[in-house]
Amino acid sequence: MNPRTLLNKRHQDALDLLASALQRDSAYEKLTGPDLASYSSEPIAGWMTTVCIKGAEIRLDVVITGTFPDDPPSIYIADRGIDLFLKNPHVEENGKICTISDSAAVDANWPVELFRYSVDAAVDILTNEITQDFLDEFTSYWSRSQGKKRREFFVVEPPSSLGKDATAVICGERILIGASYESVRQWAEHNGEKLDHLSTAGACHVVRFSSPLLPRDYPNTIADLRKLLRSNGATQALSLDRHLCKSNDLLAILFVQSTPHGDALAGILTKGYGLSRDRKLSDGFRLGHVPKSLLFARAAAKLQNGLLERANAQRVDHEWIHTRGGVGTEMFGASVCLIGCGSLGSYVAHLLAKAGIGRITLIDSQLMEWENVGRHLLGASDIGTSKAEALRIRIQRDLPHLSVEAIPRDWRAWAKECDDPFGGFDLVVSTIADWRHERSLNLLARSLDFPPVVFGWLEPFALAGHALTVTGGGGCLECGMNGFGQFEKRVLVLEDGTLKKEPGGCAYYQEYGPMRLVPCATLVAEAVVRALTGPVDASEISTLIGDLSLLSDCGGRLSKAWEKKLNPQLTEQIIIQKWTINPTCQLCSV
């Protein structure tokens, strides 16, 4: 039996069971012909029933679609003359009554009970008029009240940080809101947009309410808006009047409404009219000398029927993107330098950006090649470009509220040109996996006033990975390496060499795939976050050991030191240990 036949059979069995039950119930009559076809949700079957709501009889049509019983029936008010949209919660423009949330699970094993429950829920919605639901789900109702033209506000900074006057910039169908033009410009440019060519700047009036608005209070005209603002504070209405009379520019109004779960946002757009220069408003006075109170009163009378455009308002700021309104400022204020944008480094950089680190600098001198594609965050479209620059573009476009810089050079050459190259960073990450580079970086970390450094590297086949955090206390990288950069506390012992040589070339590489790589990248990123949020007072090393059952397939075994530390029953283990000074280390033992 193929999938379509199986799903169709379950649907038909549920429908037959439902039809049999309703045939014996005189309260229901089957929908046929035009009545059923009038619904645009591809109806398969339907029934009508009449219910009594506050002394009035209302016919409900209960419509079954091809996804029943996985999805509940759709219930509509049949009389299109009864308009309860924005009067009763959960009633849509077309008369559909939303009885069960889209995300709610239903038990498909009981189709008749699901049908009756849905009808009972619809009656309850119509009877009780649960006003609180309008407040709890304000953004949904505000969005549906907008009509056909639906522009959106993108608020690029936390609403709590905005004063009563902010900046609004039109960028296509979006209106970008921020504390200043500069903050909006930076977000837009990080998102790949140039405001000079696409935008018009104006003012944004930020209005705060102690609770969300009910639909009956949604303003349609400037007169409605002034009345609403007066009820919320006389100074807010006066501020609106000043904006309207000031110029012909765009005026955006951002509603910030307090709820138990945070601020609910809504937007309104209108346009200033430059009424301070309207001669008719100056009757009896010299132009420009009308008392402000009288000017505003005359302006209000002229503008009271001016229409408003409602808009959704979306938060796109750091706090919301990364923590949904929770903490996050600590990470946003952090600055990290990552050296090495190869396979491991690219995923580490991506994770650090997703974690919300506010400023990231990427350093790598190499170009993206075809042989990198299979296990690198970047892909075919980036071939021939700088790994650091392509990664910067990828992260910056995905997370425009962050600041990402690329330095496509050998980090040592770059560092020699700067007086204090790493002084502005809270932490440095090295995933370059080249002993000549990492030994130099370790020297700087031990010899200078230097931020903490996290060194990340993989063992063969990425069956083990390490993240060594070097701070002022404890050991350094060389405390665990021999003179040739070989790790002396490795997890795996392999009889044969694991480096592979490229055909006809001089380059070597390690065999491993993305499935083993990504957990190791997570290990390194977590070490970075732990060091930033601390305290990590002394050096430590985090080690990830993957599926030990794969060791024999690779011709390897655990080192004797690690055999004693690991639980052979676990398929993946992380062990964090203090990294102490090696008495023979030439840097730490001085």
Regions found by a protein language model. Give the residues of each.
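Domain-scale recognition of soluble eukaryotic interaction modules
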Residues: 2, 72, 79-171
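Compact alpha/beta protein-protein interaction domains typified by the UBC
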Residues: 33-102, 112-113
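Glycine-rich phosphate/adenylate-binding loop
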Residues: 133, 144-300, 423-427, 431-590
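N-terminal charged helix/coil linker that caps or initiates catalytic domains
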Residues: 274-336
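Glycine-rich adenosine-cofactor-binding loop
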Residues: 324-367
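A short acidic, amphipathic alpha-helical/loop segment
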Residues: 351, 417-418, 439-444
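Glycine-rich phosphate-binding loop and adjoining beta1-alpha1-beta2 segment
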Residues: 365-401
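A structured beta-alpha segment of the ubiquitous adenosine-cofactor-binding alpha/beta core
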Residues: 392-426, 432-434
